[in-house]
Amino acid sequence: MALQDVCKWQSPDTQGPSPHLPRAGGWAVPRGCDPQTFLQIHGPRLAHGTTTLAFRFRHGVIAAADTRSSCGSYVACPASCKVIPVHQHLLGTTSGTSADCATWYRVLQRELRLRELREGQLPSVASAAKLLSAMMSQYRGLDLCVATALCGWDRSGPELFYVYSDGTRLQGDIFSVGSGSPYAYGVLDRGYRYDMSTQEAYALARCAVAHATHRDAYSGGSVDLFHVRESGWEHVSRSDACVLYVELQKLLEPEPEEDASHAHPEPATAHRAAEDRELSVGPGEVTPGDSRMPAGTETV
């Protein structure tokens, strides 16, 4: 019996289209083809988007993100959490494929816990970033999509690293990842200072994500705000992005302009003052200091 008879490659194809794909064109995978490879070549191109950001300042590291999970034009979840705790002093933002991000963060949590048990202390943020970069770089070219910002506090203070699935690892003060990152960078570059207060940092992060969700079609929902301190990470708030943007616009509205005559009064000159004095005094009257007043005359 031939192999093609065992595999039934010559039999009529009775496989129906997948219920999870559009029916136009009949998305049935041919016999003998790898489904993943076939769909990568012939499948629909689905757009993904998000807005995540993180920045470092003197009181710790701020991480913020929107909560909309989308697949093309379909909003899969309007209230997902895109900031994942790794351990007590380490957070990570997620951008890319949700399944890949969740899987690799579980792997990172496991590896860091094993190192903590072996060494008796938590690894540094730089060690965690290097470990994640090394593990994901082995799968380069296999359609892995993970872009994350690791925010933590270790023995050297607040630290921030960006790690991508191809093995890229960068250290910096400001990172924003996702389709809404150009809009978030515009707000961050204008208002960021390393010596800002905690409330100023909260307001800056909320403002950046809110503006990005307003301009980016694939970002939305709410704004999650996290703060990593020396004592550990803290979930500060979750605010509705639309309401937050409206409140920010009200704060930026210009004050009503005053009347032009009051806003720009005519400058007083010596000639103008003399004319006003002549108008206020009658033609036959004499004012103090006038040259027509006789010498030695006192005014009452």
Curated annotation (Swiss-Prot):
<dbReference type="InterPro" id="IPR001353">
    <property type="entry name" value="Proteasome_sua/b"/>
</dbReference>
<feature type="region of interest" description="Disordered">
    <location>
        <begin position="255"/>
        <end position="300"/>
    </location>
</feature>
<comment type="subunit">
    <text>The 26S proteasome consists of a 20S proteasome core and two 19S regulatory subunits. The 20S proteasome core is composed of 28 subunits that are arranged in four stacked rings, resulting in a barrel-shaped structure. The two end rings are each formed by seven alpha subunits, and the two central rings are each formed by seven beta subunits. The catalytic chamber with the active sites is on the inside of the barrel. Incorporated instead of PSMB5 and PSMB8.</text>
</comment>
<feature type="region of interest" description="Disordered">
    <location>
        <begin position="1"/>
        <end position="23"/>
    </location>
</feature>
<comment type="function">
    <text>The proteasome is a multicatalytic proteinase complex which is characterized by its ability to cleave peptides with Arg, Phe, Tyr, Leu, and Glu adjacent to the leaving group at neutral or slightly basic pH. The proteasome has an ATP-dependent proteolytic activity. Incorporated instead of PSMB5 or PSMB8, this unit reduces the chymotrypsin-like activity of the proteasome. Plays a pivotal role in development of CD8-positive T cells.</text>
</comment>
<protein>
    <recommendedName>
        <fullName>Proteasome subunit beta type-11</fullName>
        <ecNumber>3.4.25.1</ecNumber>
    </recommendedName>
</protein>
<keyword id="KW-0645">Protease</keyword>
<keyword id="KW-0539">Nucleus</keyword>
<dbReference type="InterPro" id="IPR023333">
    <property type="entry name" value="Proteasome_suB-type"/>
</dbReference>
<dbReference type="GO" id="GO:0004175">
    <property type="term" value="F:endopeptidase activity"/>
</dbReference>
<dbReference type="InterPro" id="IPR016050">
    <property type="entry name" value="Proteasome_bsu_CS"/>
</dbReference>
<keyword id="KW-0888">Threonine protease</keyword>
<dbReference type="Pfam" id="PF00227">
    <property type="entry name" value="Proteasome"/>
</dbReference>
<dbReference type="InterPro" id="IPR000243">
    <property type="entry name" value="Pept_T1A_subB"/>
</dbReference>
<dbReference type="GO" id="GO:0004298">
    <property type="term" value="F:threonine-type endopeptidase activity"/>
</dbReference>
<dbReference type="GO" id="GO:0005829">
    <property type="term" value="C:cytosol"/>
</dbReference>
<feature type="propeptide" description="Removed in mature form">
    <location>
        <begin position="1"/>
        <end position="49"/>
    </location>
</feature>
<dbReference type="InterPro" id="IPR029055">
    <property type="entry name" value="Ntn_hydrolases_N"/>
</dbReference>
<dbReference type="GO" id="GO:0008233">
    <property type="term" value="F:peptidase activity"/>
</dbReference>
<dbReference type="GO" id="GO:0043161">
    <property type="term" value="P:proteasome-mediated ubiquitin-dependent protein catabolic process"/>
</dbReference>
<keyword id="KW-0647">Proteasome</keyword>
<feature type="active site" description="Nucleophile">
    <location>
        <position position="50"/>
    </location>
</feature>
<keyword id="KW-0378">Hydrolase</keyword>
<keyword id="KW-0963">Cytoplasm</keyword>
<dbReference type="GO" id="GO:0033077">
    <property type="term" value="P:T cell differentiation in thymus"/>
</dbReference>
<keyword id="KW-0865">Zymogen</keyword>
<dbReference type="GO" id="GO:0043374">
    <property type="term" value="P:CD8-positive, alpha-beta T cell differentiation"/>
</dbReference>
<comment type="similarity">
    <text>Belongs to the peptidase T1B family.</text>
</comment>
<dbReference type="GO" id="GO:0005634">
    <property type="term" value="C:nucleus"/>
</dbReference>
<dbReference type="GO" id="GO:0006508">
    <property type="term" value="P:proteolysis"/>
</dbReference>
<dbReference type="GO" id="GO:0019774">
    <property type="term" value="C:proteasome core complex, beta-subunit complex"/>
</dbReference>
